[in-house]
């Protein structure tokens, strides 16, 4: 057999195996969640200037792809706690401490909209809006720096989700599509 043909066959096999391994690493619940909420994340990006990739990654991580108790029982996809100014519905849930107060919503859309409002009105997040809207790494690191989550690896976890599921492509859709 010709050496070039053999080399081509080997390269093809390696490529097919690596693509198959990538597909197997993808969590089907994550894929379903992304498909369900990507348009809402893009809509929020257009309105509030928060990268859709960040919104989706946070929703995936904070809600366990919509399967967490907090997401299922109170439609809270972002782990947002009550805070002193919250006047809406609440639910008690164990987190860093037992029976902490979390915001509760009628539906996931309300959770997505409140997440955007929470970030845009929160003074501690103001610096994020100076970043390029497609700078998901800067946003992920900034959210951690601003104290959004207590997990020391929060930024890296968001970045990994964004890159593993190509969520950055939704940022481009939000930037380049017409309103």
Map each language-model feature to its residues:
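Bacterial N-terminal signal peptides that target proteins for export
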Residues: 1-9
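Catalytic cores of secreted/periplasmic lytic hydrolases that degrade extracellular macromolecules
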Residues: 2, 20-179
């Amino acid at each position: 057999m010709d050496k070039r043909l053999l080399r081509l066959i080997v390269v093809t096999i390696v490529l097919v195996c690596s693509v198959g391994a990538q597909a197997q690493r993808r969590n089907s619940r994550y894929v379903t969640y992304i498909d369900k909420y990507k348009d809402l994340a893009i809509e929020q990006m257009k309105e509030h200037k928060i990268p859709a990739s960040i919104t989706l990654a946070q929703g995936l991580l904070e809600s366990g792809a919509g399967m967490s108790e907090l997401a299922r029982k109170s439609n809270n996809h972002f782990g947002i706690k009550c805070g002193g100014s919250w006047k809406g519905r609440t639910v008690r849930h164990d987190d860093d401490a037992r029976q902490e107060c979390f915001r509760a919503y009628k539906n996931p859309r309300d959770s997505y909209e409140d997440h955007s409002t929470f970030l845009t009105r929160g003074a501690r997040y103001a610096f994020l809006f100076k970043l390029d809207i497609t700078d998901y790494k800067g946003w992920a690191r900034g959210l951690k720096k601003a104290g959004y989550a207590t997990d020391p690896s929060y930024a890296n976890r968001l970045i990994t989700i964004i890159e593993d599921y190509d969520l950055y492509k939704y940022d481009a859709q939000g930037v380049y599509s017409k309103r």
